[in-house]
Amino acid sequence: MPYFTRLILFLFCLMVLVESRKPKRKRWTGQVEMPKPSHLYKKNLDVTKIRKGKPQQLLRVDEHDFSMRPAFGGPAIPVGVDVQVESLDSISEVDMDFTMTLYLRHYWKDERLAFSSASNKSMTFDGRLVKKIWVPDVFFVHSKRSFTHDTTTDNIMLRVFPDGHVLYSMRITVTAMCNMDFSHFPLDSQTCSLELESYAYTDEDLMLYWKNGDESLKTDEKISLSQFLIQKFHTTSRLAFYSSTGWYNRLYINFTLRRHIFFFLLQTYFPATLMVMLSWVSFWIDRRAVPARVSLGITTVLTMTTIITGVNASMPRVSYVKAVDIYLWVSFVFVFLSVLEYAAVNYLTTVQERKERKLREKFPCMCGMLHSKTMMLDGSYSESEANSLAGYPRSHILTEEERQDKIVVHLGLSGEANAARKKGLLKGQTGFRIFQNTHAIDKYSRLIFPASYIFFNLIYWSVFS
């Protein structure tokens, strides 16, 4: 018994010792001020963070078969379209195409996507939902290349309204064919079209239309091209027929481009005109300066050939004549004719000199003259005067064949040469020979060539401008 009593006392003392070592808590009688929540944290309930059951999903995507179009089996579903053109990136004459960046938007109603909303607000999604629902299969007719932009993410937007109306928008760059007519190039205007059409659904299943008529096409005012002036954008629509599949609604984005002429004036027309004018310089060069006139003619011909080759290299190989071809080839003909003109002048000069030598051999100078030289007269003397100056009696008349256009005489320096002095043909007592260096063809060419080229330019610019 004493043993148990001692054990109980020992345990009691141990408990008292343990309690005495614990820290004592002070009782607070005041009020604790809690921090006030900031207005930044006052958010509405985020429904995306609430896990709901399948029947409670707003769009109920998994409950419907979206492989079929809306109202399948009924009338054609109307799909409105509007386009905002962001830029015209390039126009290629060689490939006969254009590149355009645009925002393409579709509008339709799909009751399978209707949802209840107390605030009647729409919901916006990115491109991931597009793969789960039905969207129109619009494609670009006659397109060569096209892609949807994906920087920094896919440029696709889907907006669904509570009543089931859907807005589907995407940003696209497309390169499409443009049938160009270069018969008036570079004084031409081109009309190109971007065509939109449903790939699978005929007009019995899908009715594609411009949502607001011509107002459905918007363009950026800053759109500009280096070689073209954008004159007009407008929309049209019509039906397209395929013998195997039927009729389809097709929408057209039409735009008209007028080419800037100033670039081609500097690069093509002015150089060609200068080459033609340079070829006329040979008409003022001495006809006996063969190297100068020949080298000038060849240089202008080769330069015109280079200009024509450079222009054709930047153009498609069309089977008809362009306006610039007419101008360049006519200019080339003028340059080439200037070369032929000198060939004719040189030939006639050679023939003339040969006849003069024969004439001198036929009528040798046996008039007892101390000093004599041959003189070529320019035709201002009569036949009798020329013969008298030559020391021949009037009965001896040179024939026209002998004289040709120039009369060659032997002039004696004697006291009876007063008639020749009267004509100013003698200087002192020594005879000399006067050469008429400018041929008659050169004289006429100085007027005919410039007048003809100016007349051609007047007709050309009045027809094509």
UniProtKB/Swiss-Prot annotation:
Query: Which Pfam families does this entry report, sorted A to Z?
Result: Neur_chan_LBD (PF02931), Neur_chan_memb (PF02932)
PROSITE patterns, from UniProt?
Answer: NEUROTR_ION_CHANNEL
Task: Give the reaction(s) catalysed.
Answer: chloride(in) = chloride(out)
SUPFAM superfamilies from the UniProt entry: Neurotransmitter-gated ion-channel transmembrane pore, Nicotinic receptor ligand binding domain-like
Q: Does the keyword Nucleus apply?
A: no
| Transmembrane feature ranges | 261-281, 294-314, 326-346, 444-464
List the stretches on the Cytoplasmic face of the membrane: 282-293, 347-443
Q: Which PANTHER family does UniProt cross-reference here? A: NEUROTRANSMITTER GATED ION CHANNEL
Write out the function statement from the record: Rho subunit of the pentameric ligand-gated chloride channels responsible for mediating the effects of gamma-aminobutyric acid (GABA), the major inhibitory neurotransmitter in the brain. Rho-containing GABA-gated chloride channels are a subclass of GABA(A) receptors (GABAARs) entirely composed of rho subunits, where GABA molecules bind at the rho intersubunit interfaces. When activated by GABA, rho-GABAARs selectively allow the flow of chloride anions across the cell membrane down their electrochemical gradient.
- Domain observations: GABAARs subunits share a common topological structure: a peptide sequence made up of a long extracellular N-terminal, four transmembrane domains, intracellular or cytoplasmic domain located between the third and the fourth transmembrane domains.
Mind telling me what this protein is named?
Gamma-aminobutyric acid receptor subunit rho-2
